[in-house]
Amino acid sequence: MRPLAIIGPTGAGKSQLALDVAARLGARVSVEIVNADAMQLYRGMDIGTAKLPVSERRGIPHHQLDVLDVTETATVARYQRAAAADIEAIAARGAVPVVVGGSMLYVQSLLDDWSFPATDPSVRARWERRLAEVGVDRLHAELARRDPAAAAAILPTDARRTVRALEVVELTGQPFAASAPRIGAPRWDTVIVGLDCQTTILDERLARRTDLMFDQGLVEEVRTLLRNGLREGVTASRALGYAQVIAALDAGAGADMMRAAREQTYLGTRRYVRRQRSWFRRDHRVHWLDAGVASSPDRARLVDDAVRLWRHVT
């Protein structure tokens, strides 16, 4: 069974569509879902990542959820190996793998033939020391001098990716983008469906999503994770929502600080959505569907369209 990938910006409704597609196909074939959201890999990061509770998964097996402790570093290479093994095992069982998520590099590493450039611990350590000495702003400026295209694609606050880009440029003598995957036929003949909607609609959803996270206990979730080592987690501690709450707690956890954390989480998510859209819209293989529908008949048609694409796209 060839896979179906459901991708798109945060808040578009990818997880719900995956469940609905699984229900539609369930009478004829089994479906198993493979997560492609980097932060949902972490155990305990549930509220802030909008991870589906087990009780809402309708008995459908989910893979690549809760596979890392918050102290571990999530890497695209590790995910690619593990998720590819999941997809091949699911297909071997005669079930349909459905990849669901919006983490751009994770999705593309899985669906394209992406060989990762070598790493050198001594080179990496040298750039890590440089980061500690001068800070991420100056290190990002150094990347801009060596590889302007990479610097333009990496946020100035993303220390981990800045260090990795500088390492690759030094080791290969080529721009960082030279190691990126080439878009061709997707692996396993995967059909890629994209969900998106009008910006005004999605912004409203993101505002509700952010409020719901804080109302459901994101702050307490962060407190619990801090006791489990979240602050030492290179990747997990920088996740949207979690980083903002950590900063608010460090500043005294006052009401004003928490309101600011909520607003910064919303604004940060909107910025991330812009990056997701820019990335995914470049992929000519994606079949886009309108996620702005609200009525039950329209939702049913959305599911019909996704299933039809999976069955008939060549």
Swiss-Prot record:
Binding of ATP occurs at: 8-15
Under InterPro entries, the record lists: Dimethylallyltransferase, IPT, P-loop_NTPase
Q: Which reaction does it catalyse?
A: adenosine(37) in tRNA + dimethylallyl diphosphate = N(6)-dimethylallyladenosine(37) in tRNA + diphosphate
Any single Pfam family the record assigns to this protein: IPPT
One biological process term from GO is: tRNA modification
At what residues does the UniProt record annotate the site feature described as Interaction with substrate tRNA? 103, 124
Q: Which cofactor does it need?
A: Mg(2+)
Q: Which residues bind substrate?
A: 10-15
Please provide, alphabetically and separated by semicolons, the GO molecular function terms listed in this UniProt record: ATP binding; tRNA dimethylallyltransferase activity
What keywords appear on the UniProt entry? ATP-binding, Magnesium, Nucleotide-binding, Transferase, tRNA processing
What this chain does, per the entry, is described as:
Catalyzes the transfer of a dimethylallyl group onto the adenine at position 37 in tRNAs that read codons beginning with uridine, leading to the formation of N6-(dimethylallyl)adenosine (i(6)A).
Q: Which family does it belong to?
A: Belongs to the IPP transferase family.
Assembly description:
Monomer.
What is the additional note?
A: Was identified as a high-confidence drug target.
What's the protein called, per UniProt? tRNA dimethylallyltransferase
Species for this entry: Mycobacterium tuberculosis (strain ATCC 25618 / H37Rv)
Q: Which gene encodes it?
A: miaA
